[in-house]
Amino acid sequence: MMHTVISAVANIWTAPDSPRPSDQFMLQPTVMIRDWLERMTYDERLGLCTDNVIQTQVLFGEKVLVTAEQGEWVSVIVPSQPSRKDPRGYPGWMKKYQLEKTKPIHTQHDVMISKPAAFLYRSNGEKEIELSFLTVLPLIAKENGYFKVSTVFGERFVRQSDAVPVSQQKGTAEDIIQTGAFFLGLPYLWGGISGFGFDCSGFMYSIFKANGYSIPRDAGDQAKAGKGVPLDDMKAGDLLFFAYEEGKGAIHHVGLYVGGGKMLHSPKTGKSIEILTLTETIYEKELCAVRRCFSE
């Protein structure tokens, strides 16, 4: 059965016993993602990956398929995040109370949060929850500098300066690059797929999705998306893939080519989103594939 995410950003955990004491901020219906990120040590951030703690994240209003229940936990599939792990979408576990059974909300238009984060407001002007970039909300009307939107909580508001109407037109390579550049300096987060932090493939997935493209969630799957491009014929907007053993092993990283021999990417734990010159870096040796996923 399909359920709707009611937390601003919910972690998709590897298993019900995956969360650590430091992860309690993300186990409540109203998650405290800023507190979680600010209090995690470097080792705890690294452990999200090395200890296989989380798989990905989902945003407020997204639909997930519940496949099983185990106490306070539910096994879910995220249809909006294509993955080789399951043909239906990305699998993992969530806290049951971060979801709600809802009927589909149908309006003629949607708006998308375009800032890294933005508040959802009640009609009296009180802030309700802080939403992430890429959160999509059904639009009801425009009122006094706000978008009135439909949510699982009822009618709410977001500032027009914090969101944009969802366009049916796909963005250009330059649009994708500009979307990504907006996040320069944002610290890397393993499993991250929100304006509070991205991993390498979550960053690519998100900036392409913001421009109307659906690509898989993980780098290994993204390396099969779009069309292949010779390594010496890359264009700005292409996805660059990197593999161990100087490009001959397993793919472990993805970035966005921005032209001029430079790449925009979310590097690794302890680093932040940056534009990097590829020459004389480990990435120059590890480059193994180029894929074009935008419309030319």
Swiss-Prot record:
One function term, GO molecular function aspect: cysteine-type peptidase activity
SUPFAM superfamilies, A to Z: Cysteine proteinases
Alphabetical list of Pfam families matching this protein: NLPC_P60, SH3_YKFC_2nd
Domain NlpC/P60: 170-295
Record-level GO BP terms: cell wall macromolecule catabolic process; cell wall organization; peptidoglycan metabolic process; proteolysis
Induction: Repressed by AbrB, a transcription factor that negatively controls biofilm formation.
Binding residues for substrate: Y90, D199, C200, S201, D218, A219
First-tier enzyme category under EC: hydrolase
Keyword list, A-Z: Cell wall biogenesis/degradation, Hydrolase, Protease, Thiol protease
Taxonomy, superkingdom: Bacteria
Pathway(s) it belongs to: Cell wall degradation; peptidoglycan degradation
Active-site residues from the entry: C200 (nucleophile), H253 (proton acceptor), H265
InterPro entries: NLP_P60_dom (IPR000064), Papain-like_cys_pep_sf (IPR038765), Peptidase_C40 (IPR051202)
EC number: 3.4.14.13
Catalytic activity from the UniProt record: The enzyme releases L-Ala-gamma-D-Glu dipeptides from cell wall peptides via cleavage of an L-Ala-gamma-D-Glu-|-L-Lys bond
Protein role: Specifically hydrolyzes gamma-D-glutamyl-L-lysine bonds in murein peptides, releasing L-Ala-D-Glu.
UniProt family annotation: Belongs to the peptidase C40 family.
Protein name: Gamma-D-glutamyl-L-lysine dipeptidyl-peptidase
Phylogenetic classification of the source organism: Bacteria, Bacillati, Bacillota, Bacilli, Bacillales
